[in-house]
Design a protein with these regions (language model features):
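Bacterial N-terminal signal peptides that target proteins for export
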Residues: 1-3
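C-terminal motif of bacterial Sec signal peptides marking the signal peptidase cleavage site
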Residues: 9-12
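Bacterial lipoprotein signal-peptidase II cleavage site
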Residues: 14-20
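Contiguous beta-strand segments within globular domains
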Residues: 25-47, 52
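Solvent-exposed serine/threonine-rich low-complexity stretches and specific carbohydrate-binding patches
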Residues: 64-83, 118-122
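Short, solvent-exposed, Trp/other aromatic-anchored flexible loops in extracytoplasmic proteins
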Residues: 79-113
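Short beta-strand elements
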Residues: 111-162
């Protein structure tokens, strides 16, 4: 009986916290773009409440290669229904390993309105991508470093520690 009462109180606290939320996580994935030989994190948030005019969303993505987190910042506008956050290119993503993402929604004064923490795990290793882009430029010209004049190809993956 005491356990049931504790669970009800805990559930009530969770609803209260959610009532103040400005946005919720609606999607997260690694994007592997073979054409440009890049991988990025892609996170989407769905707006729950009006966004603060002049506010900012800041996301920090764990660097799969190690080192400090990769951070992006984006202005918020009241008309936004969803917020899309994409990391700078990342390297050495490993299949099944959860990588951390921390998101902060800030009001115009820089005060934190909400934080969201999550992880993203890829279902493939980054070695599915070649180390060099397959095409160059807006016309998708073949990259001569990959498609050589002698007819051979170079699809080797990027060198990453194991």
């Amino acid at each position: 009986m005491l356990m049931m009462l504790s669970l009800l109180c805990l559930a009530g606290c969770q609803r209260e916290a959610a009532d103040d939320d400005v946005a919720e996580l609606s999607g997260k994935i690694f994007v592997f773009n073979y054409r440009v030989a890049q991988a990025t994190y892609l996170v989407t948030l769905r707006r729950l409440r009006p966004l603060p005019e002049g506010g900012v969303v800041e996301a920090s993505f764990e660097d799969p290669r190690g080192g400090p987190p990769l951070t992006v910042q984006q202005r918020l506008f009241p008309v936004m229904e969803k917020i899309v956050l994409e990391s700078p290119p990342v390297h050495c993503v490993k299949k099944g390993k959860p990588y951390g993402v921390a998101i902060r929604l800030l009001d115009p004064q820089g005060d934190e309105r909400q934080t969201i923490e999550t992880t993203i795990a890829s279902n493939v290793d980054q070695d599915v991508l070649p180390a060099k882009p397959l095409s160059l430029g807006p016309a998708y010209d073949r990259n001569p470093e990959v498609f050589r004049l002698d007819g051979s190809t170079e699809f080797s993956p990027e060198n990453c520690p194991t």
